[in-house]
Amino acid sequence: MAYTLDDFDYDLPHELIAQTPIKQRDTSRLLVLDHQANTLEDKHFYDILDELHAGDAVVMNNSRVMPARLYGIKPETGGHVEVLLLHNVEGDVWETLMKPAKRLRVGTTVTFGDGQLTATVTEEREDGIRLIEFHYDGIFMEILEQLGETPLPPYIKEKLDDPDRYQTVYAKENGSAAAPTAGLHWTQELLDQVAAKGVKLVYITLHVGLGTFRPVEEANIEDHKMHSEFYRLDEAAAATLNEVRANGGRIIATGTTSIRTLETIGTKFKGEIKPDSGWTDIFIKPGYQWQVVNAFITNFHLPKSTLVMLVAAFTGRDQILNAYHHAIEEKYRFFSFGDAMFIK
């Protein structure tokens, strides 16, 4: 069946968009959707323990959000410049989104902080994208931690008191422009309890790009072009997942980024799980044939977003929109700092 963009729309009261993280990560609410039984249960995230069984694997994305927003000036004019780091091309060359782009030509220099970091535009691309090369003394990531800000999603209007609350407790690999937010609910203590139950904890890496916030503009969703994101699944992770599968356990993904990684690999290797890394622009939507993931944890996503379509590919459109309407009635909190779903 052909879907249009409006098929994935729903009305969300503005006050249900969570502006701040909940005090204790795992006390957020959890809406459990049993896809086969077509049932909904209202729980809390710490109840996820009851949903996981010995022999299952929980997959998490260990990408870390970088303080990817920098504010600088052009020394020759004093003009202000905003830079958003998208990804590291090679060495000190980065693909960035710069404002005001039309004034930033090849050869333009920008200075950050009190001059401990400078950058030169090396290539102009469309949509405000620029390649820039950084110049500095010392360690780039340490300088970035000092000078950069963590970019929050556009619908979050409040400043974050503690930047660590926009990182998962297992964030390790620098590279994301946005957090893999389903993972924000996990605490180290809860993960320890999960492991003690005989569930395997598996880490993959997918660096979340800003395209994750890019709205779908095509009425026919088939025409939408997905952004690309870098992913990696190492040999140890692949071996664990294959062992779990062989023994009849479930592969449970934490978040859409883990899903995209696992399904990219499953699609590429015709259902098999192999170590792999590369760039993925997989668009999972209704009609998609699932290869790897048996169940997953995810937050509540924006109306008309590719992430709602991804979830609908697992549940069917009507079932997920019905669950969202239930969540709205029950005043669940939505989006990045909001509550979670467990879909099985």
From Swiss-Prot:
Catalytic activity: 7-aminomethyl-7-carbaguanosine(34) in tRNA + S-adenosyl-L-methionine = epoxyqueuosine(34) in tRNA + adenine + L-methionine + 2 H(+)
Residues passing through the membrane, by range: none
Gene3D superfamilies (alphabetical): QueA-like
GO MF annotation, one: S-adenosylmethionine:tRNA ribosyltransferase-isomerase activity
GO biological process, one term: queuosine biosynthetic process
UniProt subcellular location: Cytoplasm
Main EC class the enzyme belongs to: transferase
The UniProt record lists the keyword Cytoplasm: yes
UniProt KW S-adenosyl-L-methionine keyword: yes
Key words, A-Z: Cytoplasm, Queuosine biosynthesis, S-adenosyl-L-methionine, Transferase
Similarity comment text for this entry: Belongs to the QueA family.
NCBIfam families with a match to the protein in the record: PRK00147.1, queA
Subunit structure: Monomer.
UniProt function note: Transfers and isomerizes the ribose moiety from AdoMet to the 7-aminomethyl group of 7-deazaguanine (preQ1-tRNA) to give epoxyqueuosine (oQ-tRNA).
Protein name per UniProt: S-adenosylmethionine:tRNA ribosyltransferase-isomerase
The species this protein was found in: Levilactobacillus brevis (strain ATCC 367 / BCRC 12310 / CIP 105137 / JCM 1170 / LMG 11437 / NCIMB 947 / NCTC 947) (Lactobacillus brevis)
